[in-house]
Each structure stands twice: as structure tokens, then as C-alpha cells.
Curated annotation (Swiss-Prot):
Similarity comment: Belongs to the universal ribosomal protein uS12 family.
Ranges where the record places region Disordered: 33-55
Lineage: Bacteria, Bacillati, Bacillota, Bacilli, Bacillales
Keyword set includes Ribosomal protein: yes
A Pfam short name: Ribosom_S12_S23
Protein name in the entry: Small ribosomal subunit protein uS12
Protein's UniProt keywords contain Ribonucleoprotein: yes
PANTHER family membership: 30S RIBOSOMAL PROTEIN S12 FAMILY MEMBER
Organism: Bacillus velezensis (strain DSM 23117 / BGSC 10A6 / LMG 26770 / FZB42) (Bacillus amyloliquefaciens subsp. plantarum)
Source species, domain of life: Bacteria
Gene (name only): rpsL
Subunit structure: Part of the 30S ribosomal subunit. Contacts proteins S8 and S17. May interact with IF1 in the 30S initiation complex.
């Protein structure tokens, strides 16, 4: 326990929390060619690679991912949610934060139904999360 005098001389230091999605906290001013500290909820980027990776133990699957170069120049790995996708190299995508627990190094999700990413086909429930339009009533 510190004494009152010690606290007066050197107060409590609050902990600094690191961001879980640091690429969203950086901007880029292309006119001045400098990085800025402007946070954004989503960012646009171009796919440089699309592929599959295997999850950590004890899970087993082929999870779809894309390597994305963002508008701020940072390259990140983003997960492609849902069944099936239409992404390929040079597709323009929108990413949001949110890690995938069983894929190491994947801290971002691609937003389905935005920009070049199509929504999931034939999805009836939870459509808004997968960019699927409401089916026509028959």
C-alpha cells in the first residue's frame, strides 16, 4: 500500500488497453501521404489472396479467408462468413472487426452483401448478418 505522500508525488497510472482490431484505428491521407489516427467502424480493401485454412485443435474444417489490403495501406487477414462466396483476387470488400476464435491471426470479418461481396444464397434466418435479401412471398 502506498502512502498518501507517495500517491501525491506519483499518482495511479491507468492501464492502457490495446485495440483488438488495430487496422480500423488507422487512416491514411493520400494527399499529404501521411497516416492519421482516425478510427472507423469498417474499412474498404482489395483482396490480394483468397483461400482456406484449417482451424486450431480440436476443430476440423476448411475455413474461408481473404488477405485484404486496406485503403490505409495495412494488409490484414479477414474471415469470409456464410456458406459459399464469390470473392477472388482484386475483389473490393468491406471489413469489420471481430476475430475468429479458432483461426490464429484472423481479427476481421468481411461484410456480406456490401461492395463486391454477394450475400449468402437461400438463407432464411439471420439474413441481415449475411447480406441476404428477403425472399419473395409466393
Amino acid at each position: 500500500m502506498p502512502t498518501i505522500n507517495q500517491l501525491i508525488r506519483k499518482g495511479r497510472v491507468s492501464k492502457v488497453e490495446n485495440s483488438k482490431s488495430p487496422a480500423l484505428n488507422k487512416g491514411y491521407n493520400s494527399f499529404k501521404k501521411e497516416h492519421t489516427n482516425v478510427s472507423s467502424p469498417q474499412k474498404r480493401g482489395v483482396c490480394t489472396r483468397v483461400g482456406t485454412m484449417t482451424p486450431k485443435k480440436p476443430n476440423s474444417a476448411l475455413r474461408k479467408y481473404a488477405r485484404v489490403r486496406l485503403t490505409n495501406g495495412i494488409e490484414v487477414t479477414a474471415y469470409i462468413p456464410g456458406i459459399g462466396h464469390n470473392l477472388q483476387e482484386h475483389s473490393v470488400v468491406l471489413i469489420r472487426g471481430g476475430r475468429v476464435k479458432d483461426l490464429p491471426g484472423v481479427r476481421y470479418h468481411i461484410v456480406r452483401g456490401a461492395l463486391d461481396t454477394a450475400g449468402v444464397e437461400n438463407r432464411a434466418q439471420g439474413r441481415s448478418k449475411y447480406g441476404t435479401k428477403r425472399p419473395k412471398a409466393k
